A protein has these predicted regions:
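Conserved ATP-binding N-box helix of the HATPase_c
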Residues: 31-56
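Short beta-strand-loop-beta element adjacent to the nucleotide/active-site pocket used for signaling
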Residues: 65-73
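Glycine-rich phosphate-binding loop
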Residues: 96-111
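Bergerat-fold GHKL ATPase/HATPase_c domain
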Residues: 1-38
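Flexible, glycine-/charge-rich segments associated with ATP-binding catalytic modules
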Residues: 1-12, 108-130
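Glycine-rich/acidic phosphate-handling loop/turn and adjacent ATP-lid/helix
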Residues: 73-100
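A conserved short beta-strand within the histidine kinase catalytic ATPase domain
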Residues: 57-65
């Protein structure tokens, strides 16, 4: 299997769900569609609101690489990336109904590895048969 590596640039959130569905279809990862869709929706939404401060003139860059059984995702915003970002291991019952704050937790739960380096979120997921 040849590695597939691409980059997509988007502005705002109007077309991100269609782009995500296109990535899943292009890579033939329909069996993992729920996980990948959830991961990318949360990462792109986080980049838009927190990195780009809801400015739809600033790009969000999504890079993806499928090599063998490993899917590598990068979501880069246009922010300064100076703050620290923690992917929580758990959320309390009180936080379950909060307006925000679950996105990073969900990314952590549905990926094998997630970290933020400056203004880029790096996410890794095994797409091997169970």
């Amino acid at each position: 299997m040849n590695a597939v590596q691409k980059e997509i640039r988007l502005y705002g959130l109007e077309q991100h769900q269609g782009i995500i569905d296109g990535i899943i279809q292009e890579l033939g990862l329909e069996d993992y569609a729920f996980d990948i869709r959830l991961i990318l929706i949360e990462a792109i939404t986080n980049a838009y609101y927190h990195g780009n401060l809801s400015d739809c003139t600033k790009p969000i860059i999504v890079r993806y690489l499928l090599s063998g059984k490993r899917l590598e995702l990068q979501v880069e915003d246009s922010g300064e990336g100076s703050g620290s970002l923690v992917f929580p291991e758990a959320i309390s019952g009180d936080e379950l109904l909060d307006e925000g704050g679950r996105g990073l937790y969900l990314i952590r739960c549905f990926s094998d590895k997630a970290e933020m380096v400056r203004n880029t979120m790096y996410i890794s997921k095994c797409v091997c048969p169970t």
